[in-house]
Amino acid sequence: MGKIWRISGPLVIGEDMKGAQVYEIVEIGTQRLVGEVIGLEEDKAIIQVHEDTLELKVGEAIRGTGAILTAELGPGIVGSIYDGLQKSLTVLMEQGSFIERGARVFPLPRDKKWPFTPKVKVGDRVSQGDIIGTVPETHLLEHRIMVPVGMKGIIKKIAEGNYTIEEPVAQIEVDGKVKEITMLQKWPVRKPRPYKQRFAPSKLLVTGMRILDYMFPLALGGKAAIPGGFGTGKTVALQQLARWAQTQLNIYVGCGERGNEMADVLYSFRQLKEPTTGRLLQEKEVFIANTSNMPVVAREASVFVGITLAEYFRDMGYDVLLVADSTSRWAEAMREIGGRLEEIPGEEGFPAYLGSRLSSFYERAGRVECLGSPGREGSVTVAGAVSPPGADFSEPVTQNTLRIVDAFYALDTSLANKRHFPAINWLTSYSLYVD
């Protein structure tokens, strides 16, 4: 498609890029590093690279893929550990202790067979969102196979059996043509998944933290922020939410935080048991680890991959909790990219579009009526940590987040210094979900 014209850290500008589209995935250099087109000007393209650009040279080739950043959806997600681009870290670990640049692995296992049980029969008319079968993904969660968005027709073939995610489990006649349905679906991470209607948040989400459930309740499908200075317990508070919240699935996104904290999360969740069934808590968790030493650009991808996975399970009729630690690190990545693009900075150097980017993430939370039959409701609840420097809540990330969320759990440095945990200041915090 083109070649490298300029390199500035994680930012690459390519020339001779006519035909490229915004948010298209490209492969850069001899190692075929993954990049994403974020801007176009005449025949030049601005590309943010999701991997380390060390040893890249001006003049190396840039190859277009014609595809945009998508998440793979299907059996095998629950219990997995991904990086910000949904590469399976479990598979990458088998290749060595360090992640090689340009490494390519599938997010979902291609050779594993899953027992598929049909819920419809030949001759039934189905449309987008209809549940056509189920797969027992873990002991705690049943994976419901749905008709892909935009497809409807009559079932021509469906059978019980063991299938891989790429083998067709059903055939549908659409306008005289037969199309196959597999258990594997793909969805653009920046595009919200559709639903029938959205409900006002009215049902309580039991978080398992008494101060929240009693004084500052969080609703199913709600949005919450947990801001606090260094050492006030943001990560521990989010971990407690992910452990004990009464939801069917929890997604933990470690976005730009310390690697040892993520290692502690992974270790502890493999030991803890779900209180109602006694099964391991890992059987209802998904982990996305994008630590502070990983490429900064992938921080944005990690939160959008996480919310896309959450919406997918919401469409099955499940209540999903997504915790993001921390959205401030994502905002810092936006500030770094904005600086390298020589954009006019906003307050404290953050880009002027900081608020709209945060909104595009938080506003995908909600309790909805799902597409298809049988009729069902699902929800995505989002809780994000904010790390204001010096515990200054007047800084831009906290203030922009405050405009979006309906529950605000302010962590107090003085309480944390007294070893009062969770260090939630009951005078500053509030919840708009209280009647």
Segments the model singles out, each with a brief description of its role:
Residues 27, 62-64, 127, 133, ...:
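Hydrophobic beta-strand signal
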Residues 17, 31, 67-68, 86, ...:
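Short, surface-exposed secondary-structure boundary micro-motifs
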Residues 94-148, 164-222, 237-240, 275-294, ...:
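P-loop NTPase nucleotide-binding/switch module
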